[in-house]
């Protein structure tokens, strides 16, 4: 806060500029730290935070500023998920604006990446194992689980090419948010199972086959320069957009609907903050909040478009019942899967049996058994 410190005996209130709006925030007065009240301690930390918050922050060009109806401000950092520059942009933005809330493009099913070390995450991201497939199928069902694994294969391909783990900007946001007093950390993305189930429901059987084929045979080389050149449109999302461009319904469920959900979560976070009161007799004091959103660059235009519109997220949180063709294709895929599995087990068992029987020891035992039969 600007201005001179007042003597301890003078109780006064000084307006503090936060996010461009002047609000009355009680000044914390000097005194014995042992006798400071909880309210005074809160106000002291808040004052320190507001002093660090820049009225005219120097922000990266990847930041879009939005203003809520109550004056709260949202700084949306558009990122490339495999970019060192994006990590630096996130750190700089959080340090400049000292937010009250940080919202990231993650859901509870991906929150584990926030606390993994880089080496472990890099190893995990490169591996697309049978265990991961089983977990995805248990969590999302057969078709959605297989689709999730195919998309993980895309991410693993980029990870392998770049030697860089995904989600670095989210981990940086998590670390920086923990350094800002009273800063909350929100998960702002729609749950993965809902997204994949709605995506699968939007495709016909042949569209699913065509998409799976494209994902299975992805092998184009990628360099770090490619990532930075794609800063205006996230590399992972650009690759996905190229593959799903001919499937408008899939683009709607994976991109457009999540734009709506992310916008809703950012608006929920951007609410005026009520300051604590020393007693119930004191009037309520509120200040506009400051929010930093960390999302893929491809979602920024959709968030801007939806910011001032009425949003209904209930309809994008439900999974429509499968159509007749969908049920038929599901049965066909399951039958093909288990048929292939059964044939593979039969073929392996037969080969193993023939191999065992061809061993000299096995032939000797069979000969002894044959000689021991009565009547021979």
From Swiss-Prot:
Natural source organism: Mus musculus (Mouse)
One of the record's GO cellular component terms: mitochondrial outer membrane
Modified sites of kind Phosphothreonine: 64
Gene: Trabd
Domain of life: Eukaryota
PANTHER family with a match to the protein in the record: PHEROMONE SHUTDOWN PROTEIN, TRAB DOMAIN-CONTAINING PROTEIN
Keywords tagged on the record: Acetylation, Phosphoprotein
Keyword Phosphoprotein: yes
Name this protein carries in UniProt: TraB domain-containing protein
Record PTM N-acetylmethionine, positions in chain: 1
BP GO terms, sorted: mitochondrial fusion
GO MF terms held by the record: mitochondrion-mitochondrion outer membrane tether activity
């Amino acid at each position: 806060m600007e201005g001179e410190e007042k003597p301890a005996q003078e109780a006064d209130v000084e307006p503090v500029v936060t996010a461009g709006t002047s609000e009355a925030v009680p000044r914390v007065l000097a005194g014995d730290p042992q006798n400071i009240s909880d309210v005074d301690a809160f106000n002291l930390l808040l004052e320190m935070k507001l002093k660090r918050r820049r009225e005219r922050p120097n922000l990266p060009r990847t930041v879009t500023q939005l203003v809520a109806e109550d004056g709260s401000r949202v700084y949306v950092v558009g990122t490339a998920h495999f970019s060192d520059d994006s990590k630096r942009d996130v750190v700089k933005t959080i340090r400049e604006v000292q937010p009250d809330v940080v919202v990231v493009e993650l859901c509870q099913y991906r929150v584990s990446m926030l606390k993994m070390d880089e080496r472990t995450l890099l190893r995990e991201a490169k591996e697309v194992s049978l265990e991961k497939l089983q977990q995805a199928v248990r969590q999302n069902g057969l078709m959605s689980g297989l689709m999730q694994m195919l998309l993980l294969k895309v991410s693993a391909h980029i990870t392998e090419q770049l030697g860089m783990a995904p989600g670095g900007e989210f981990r940086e946001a998590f670390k920086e948010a923990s350094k800002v007093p009273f800063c909350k950390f929100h998960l702002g993305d729609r749950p993965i199972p809902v997204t994949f189930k709605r995506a699968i429901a939007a495709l016909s059987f042949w569209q699913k086959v065509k998409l799976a084929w494209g994902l299975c045979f992805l092998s184009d080389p990628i360099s770090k320069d490619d990532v930075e050149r794609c800063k205006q449109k996230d590399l992972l999302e650009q690759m996905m957009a190229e593959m799903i461009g001919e499937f408008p319904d899939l683009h709607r469920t994976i991109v457009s609907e999540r734009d709506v959900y992310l916008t809703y979560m950012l608006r929920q976070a951007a609410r005026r903050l009520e300051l604590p009161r020393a007693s119930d007799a004191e009037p309520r004091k509120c200040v506009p909040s400051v929010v930093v959103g960390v999302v893929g660059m491809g979602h920024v235009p959709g968030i801007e478009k939806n910011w001032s519109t009425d949003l209904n997220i209930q309809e994008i949180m439900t999974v429509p019942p499968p159509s007749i063709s969908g049920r038929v294709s599901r049965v066909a895929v399951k039958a093909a899967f288990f048929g292939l599995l059964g044939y593979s087990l039969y073929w392996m068992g037969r080969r193993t049996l023939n191999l065992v029987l061809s061993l000299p020891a096995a032939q000797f035992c069979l000969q002894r058994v044959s000689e021991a039969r009565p009547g021979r």
